[in-house]
Curated annotation (Swiss-Prot):
CDD domains: Terpene_cyclase_plant_C1. This is Ent-cassa-12,15-diene synthase. It comes from Oryza sativa subsp. indica. Involved in phytocassane phytoalexins biosynthesis. Catalyzes the conversion of ent-copalyl diphosphate to the phytoalexin precursor ent-cassa-12,15-diene. The lineage of its organism: Eukaryota, Viridiplantae, Streptophyta, Embryophyta, Tracheophyta. InterPro entries: Isoprenoid_synthase_dom_sf, Terpene_cyclase_plant_C1, Terpene_synth_N, Terpene_synth_N_sf, Terpene_synthase-like, Terpene_synthase_metal-bd, Terpenoid_cyclase/PrenylTrfase.
Length: 830
C-alpha cells in the first residue's frame, strides 16, 4: 500500500515517545504501496473465477484463470504436468515450512489506541499508528483485501476502528475524513440483518459509534440509524444479562474492546493465557489493557508489534492450527503423499506440543480436536482424555466456540469422535452423541441453507470416516474447496498461503488419476471377455464395482497393477461365491475345489462342466500371474500364499453350501469361523498386499498380528453383509445368516431388530480394534501401508453395506463409480 496524502504532523513514529524496543522476525504478509487500481497486497488472493473442469487440459486452463480453446488447453496441461506441477509442489512445500499471517487493520487499530502508561496523550505503539496512516485504500477504507470492491460489515468495522485510532492521537485528518465518508456511503450495510457479520459486530460497532460521537467525530449517518443500532445492542446485552455461564463470560472477554466498562476486569483476566493475551487475540488484549493495566498483556502486544513491524494479525500464535489445517487439506484432497517429510515434521512438532499441553492446542476446541484426529490417524499415541473437557455438551458450551455455536468447531469434534480405537471410549462416544445432535439441529437452520457448510455437515453425518472411499472424499473436498480460505472472526482472518496451489495440484492429480482409471477399467472389461467370464449365466457382472473399491483406495498413479489385481480378485470371489451360493451344482463345486487343491493345468476331461472350466482357468491364470509379479518384487515366493488363501475361501464356501443343502443350522460361532473367510476379502487384500511397494518378510501371513487383522476385517464384512442381506436371504430360503442365527439361539427371546443391534455392537467393537492395530505400534514386520489395506477394505465394506447390499443392488454404487472414474470435475470457484 502507498501513503495517501501527507500526514498533518510529520513522521508519527518520531513524534510519539514510548516506542517499543526493536526485535523479532517479521512473518507478516508484506504490505505493498497501494496502487490506484486497488490491487491486493502481495500474498493475498484476488477475485474468483467460476470453473468447470472437463479434463486435465481444461483443468490447467481453468486453474490459470484462462478461457482457452481445446488445443491451447491441451498444451497448457502438458506444461502443468511437467514444469508447473513441480513448481506447485515446491510452492506448497515452502508454505508447509512456515505460516505467514495476514495483517488485521481492525486489531492493529485497537492496539494503536492503547495509551502509554503514565502518559495518556501518547500511544504505547506509535508504529501501529504509522501503519494505519500508510495503509488506507483509495476509497477511504481499511480492509484485509482492497481488491474486493464491495463493502461489508467487516470493512466497516475495521475502517471505523482505524478512524478512532487516528482521531485518538489527533493525526491523519484527511485519512479520517475519507474514512468517515466511506462509512457514510456504505452505512446501510450495517443496518442489513441479512448481511454476513463478524463475531460481536452488534456489540462492537455500536460501541465504536458511541465512542466516535463522544470524541467529537461527526459520522455522516442519520442519528436514528445510530440509535437503532444502539437499541439492538442494549437488547442483546439485556437478553443475556442473566446468563452467568463460563461460555458467556468468555464471549464478553473476547469482545473486551466492545463491552468496555461493562466488564468486571478481575473476572475477565481469568481468561488470560500464559503469553499474556486474551484468546491469543490482539484486539481483545488491547481492549482489556486500555481499562486494566497488566504487564503480561503489555508484553504480549509489544512482542507482536515488534515481530510484525507495526501491524498485528487477528490471532497469534496460530501456527499449529494453520499448519494442521494445511496437512488436513492435503490429506482431504489426496495429495499428501507428495509432502510426506514436511507433514511428518509438522506432526512431530504438534505431538511435542500435545505432550506439553501447549495452550495453543488445549485451549482451542477446534485445534485440539483436529490435532487429536490427525495425530491418531498418523500413528501417534494420543489419549481421548485430553478431550474430556468437551465430553458433554455443557463442557462445549462453556467454551467460546460453544457459546458462539460455531459450526466448524462442532463439525470438527464430531469427526474426531469417530476415531475411537477402544470398545468403550466413553469420551469420544459422548462427544459423538451431542455433537451429532447439534449438527442435525444446524441442518434445520436457515443460516446454512444452500451453502458448502451444509453439504459438509450432511456428508459427515451420513458417511462417518470409516464408511468412505478415499477418492470419493478427495473429489468432494476438491469440489467444495474454498481457495480463499478465510474465516470470519471479529474480523476476517485470511491465511496468506496460496490455497490455489493446493487446489491446482489436487485438480491435476485427480484428472490424471481419472484418465488412468478409465484405461485400467477398459483393460478389466477386456479381461472379463478374454476369459469368457461374461458367459457365466449365474454370475453378477460387477467388474466396475470391484474396480471402484480398488481405485478409490489404492489410488496413487504407481499402484495401477495393485488396483487391477485387487479388482480381478474381488470379481473372482464374487463369481465363485455365486457358483456356490446360487448357480452351481454340487458336483461343480466339488470339481472346482479338487482342481484348486491340485493347482496344476488340468486336462480337458478333468472339468465337470464348461462353467467350471471358465472359472478355474481364469482363477488359475490370474493367481499365477499376480503371484509371479509379487514374487519378483518381494524376492521370495508369494504365489503359495495366494493359493492357500484361495483354498481357505473356497473350502469355507463349500461348508456353507453343504449347510444350506442339508438345512443344517450351525452355531453362531461355527458360522462366523467360516463366514468371515468365505466373503473373500482376505484374498482381495492379499492380492494387493505384496504389490504396493513395501517389502514383507517371508511368512508374514502366518504372523499373529496378520491373522488378527484378517479376523477383525472378516468379522466386519460378514456381519455387515448379514444385516443388509437378511431379508433377501430369508426370502431365498437361506437360514445361515448371523442375525437369524442369533435369533434362533435365543430361543425366541430376541427379536430380529434386537439381533441386528447386537450384531452392530460386534461390528463396532471389531472395527475399533482393527483401527487400533492399524494406527498403533509403528515398529514391526508389517508396515503400516500394508496394515492400511485391511482398514481400507473395512471402510469399503461399511460403504457397500451402508443401507442395502450395495453389491447386489444395481443402482447403489452407480454414483460412486461415476464420481471416481467417469464424471469430470466441476469446481464451483477458485
Amino acid at each position: 500500500m502507498m501513503l495517501l496524502g501527507s500526514p498533518s504532523s510529520g513522521g508519527y513514529g518520531g513524534k510519539f515517545a514510548g516506542a517499543s524496543p526493536a526485535g523479532g522476525t517479521t512473518t507478516m504478509a508484506p504490505s505493498a504501496k497501494q496502487p490506484s487500481s486497488r490491487a491486493p497486497p502481495p500474498g493475498i488472493t484476488g477475485g474468483r473465477n467460476d470453473l468447470r473442469i472437463l479434463s486435465p487440459a481444461a483443468a490447467a486452463a481453468a486453474v490459470g484463470g484462462l478461457e482457452m480453446k481445446k488445443p491451447e488447453a491441451e498444451g497448457i496441461a502438458e506444461s502443468l504436468q511437467a514444469t508447473h506441477r513441480k513448481e506447485l509442489e515446491a510452492s506448497i512445500r515452502k508454505q508447509l515450512q512456515g505460516v505467514e499471517l495476514s495483517p488485521s487493520p481492525y486489531d492493529t487499530a485497537w492496539v494503536a489506541m492503547v495509551p502509554l502508561r503514565g502518559s495518556s496523550h501518547n500511544p504505547s505503539f506509535p508504529q501501529c499508528v504509522d501503519w494505519i496512516l500508510e495503509n488506507q485504500w483509495d476509497d477511504g477504507s481499511w480492509s484485509i483485501d482492497g481488491s474486493i470492491s464491495t463493502a461489508n460489515k467487516d470493512v466497516l468495522s475495521s475502517t471505523l476502528a482505524c478512524v478512532l485510532a487516528l482521531n485518538k492521537w489527533n493525526v491523519g485528518r484527511e485519512h479520517i475524513r475519507r474514512g468517515l465518508s466511506f462509512i457514510g456511503r456504505n452505512f446501510s450495510i450495517a443496518m442489513d440483518d441479512q448481511a454476513v457479520a463478524p463475531i460481536g459486530f452488534g456489540i462492537t460497532f455500536p460501541a465504536m459509534l458511541t465512542l466516535a460521537n463522544g470524541s467529537g467525530l461527526e459520522v455522516p449517518v442519520r442519528q436514528n440509524d445510530i440509535d437503532s443500532l444502539n437499541h439492538l445492542r442494549e437488547m442483546k446485552i439485556q437478553r443475556e444479562a442473566g446468563n452467568h455461564s463460563r461460555g458467556r463470560k468468555a464471549y464478553m472477554a473476547y469482545l473486551a474492546e466492545g463491552f468496555g466498562n461493562l466488564l468486571e476486569w478481575d473476572e475477565i483476566m481469568m481468561f488470560q493465557r500464559k503469553n499474556g493475551s486474551l484468546f491469543n487475540c490482539p484486539s481483545s488484549t488491547a481492549g482489556a489493557l486500555a481499562n486494566y493495566h497488566d504487564d503480561k498483556a503489555l508484553q504480549y502486544l509489544q512482542s507482536l508489534v515488534n515481530k510484525f513491524d507495526g501491524v498485528v494479525p487477528t490471532l497469534y500464535p496460530l501456527n499449529i492450527y494453520c499448519q494442521l489445517s494445511m496437512v488436513d487439506a492435503l490429506e482431504n484432497m489426496g495429495i499428501s503423499q507428495y509432502f510426506a517429510s514436511e507433514i511428518k515434521s509438522i506432526l512431530d512438532m504438534t505431538y511435542s506440543s500435545w505432550l506439553g499441553r501447549d495452550e495453543e492446542i488445549m485451549l482451542d476446541v477446534t485445534t485440539c480436536a483436529m490435532a487429536f484426529r490427525l495425530l491418531r490417524m498418523n500413528g501417534y499415541d494420543v489419549s481421548s482424555d485430553e478431550l474430556s473437557h468437551v465430553a458433554g455438551a455443557s463442557g462445549f458450551r462453556d467454551s467460546l466456540q460453544g457459546y458462539l455455536n460455531d459450526r466448524k468447531s462442532v463439525l470438527e469434534v464430531y469427526k474426531t469422535s469417530k476415531h475411537s480405537i477402544s470398545e468403550n471410549d466413553l469420551i469420544l462416544d459422548s462427544i459423538g452423541s451431542w455433537s451429532g445432535s447439534l449438527l442435525k439441529e444446524m441442518l434445520c437452520s436457515n443460516g446454512i441453507q444452500g451453502t458448502p457448510g451444509r453439504e459438509e455437515i450432511e456428508f459427515a453425518l451420513k458417511y462417518p470416516f470409516y464408511s468412505t472411499l478415499e477418492r470419493l472424499v478427495h473429489r468432494k473436498n476438491i469440489v467444495l474447496f474454498d481457495a480463499k480460505g478465510s474465516q470470519m472472526l471479529k474480523t476476517e482472518c485470511m491465511p496468506v498461503h496460496d490455497s490455489q496451489d493446493f487446489l491446482a495440484l489436487a485438480v491435476d492429480d485427480f484428472c490424471i488419476s481419472q484418465s488412468n482409471y478409465q484405461n485400467e477399467l477398459n483393460y478389466l472389461e477386456s479381461w472379463v471377455k478374454d476369459n469368457r467370464l461374461d458367459q457365466l449365466h449365474f454370475a453378477r457382472q460387477k467388474i466396475t464395482y470391484c474396480y471402484l473399491s480398488g481405485a478409490a483406495t489404492t489410488f496413487r498413479p504407481e499402484m495401477g497393477y495393485a488396483r487391477t489385481s485387487w479388482a480381478r480378485t474381488a470379481w473372482l470371489t464374487a463369481v465363485i461365491d455365486d457358483l456356490f451360493d446360487v448357480g452351481g451344482l454340487e458336483q461343480e463345486q466339488e470339481n472346482l475345489l479338487a482342481l484348486m487343491e491340485k493347482w496344476e493345468e488340468p486336462g480337458e476331461d478333468e472339468y465337470y462342466s464348461e462353467d467350471v472350466k471358465i472359472v478355474f482357468q481364469a482363477l488359475y491364470n490370474t493367481v499365477n500371474e499376480i503371484g509371479a509379479k509379487a514374487s519378483a518384487l518381494q524376492g521370495h515366493d508369494v504365489t503359495k500364499y495366494l493359493v492357500d488363501v484361495w483354498l481357505h475361501v473356497v473350502r469355507c464356501m463349500k461348508v456353507e453350501a453343504e449347510w444350506q443343502r442339508s438345512q443344517h443350522l450351525p452355531t453362531f460361532e461355527e458360522y462366523m469361523e467360516s463366514g468371515m473367510v468365505s466373503l473373500g476379502q482376505g484374498a482381495t487384500v492379499m492380492s494387493a498386499l505384496f504389490l504396493i511397494g513395501e517389502k514383507l518378510p517371508e511368512g508374514v501371513v502366518e504372523l499373529e498380528e496378520y491373522d488378527e487383522m484378517f479376523r477383525l476385517m472378516g468379522t466386519c464384512g460378514r456381519l455387515l453383509n448379514d444385516i443388509r442381506g437378511i431379508e433377501r436371504e430369508e426370502s431365498d430360503g437361506k437360514m445361515t445368516n448371523g442375525v437369524s442365527l442369533l435369533v434362533h439361539a435365543s430361543g425366541g427371546s430376541m427379536s430380529v431388530d434386537e439381533a441386528k443391534t447386537e450384531v452392530m455392537k460386534r461390528i463396532d467393537a471389531s472395527r475399533r480394534k482393527l483401527l487400533s492395530l492399524v494406527v498403533g505400534e509403528q515398529e514391526g514386520p508389517i508396515p503400516r501401508p500394508c496394515k492400511q489395506l485391511f482398514w481400507k477394505m473395512c471402510k469399503i465394506l461399511h460403504l457397500f453395506y451402508y443401507q442395502t447390499d450395495g453389491f447386489s443392488s444395481p443402482k447403489e454404487m452407480v454414483s460412486a463409480v461415476d464420481a471416481v472414474i467417469k464424471e469430470p470435475l466441476q469446481l464451483r470457484s477458485l
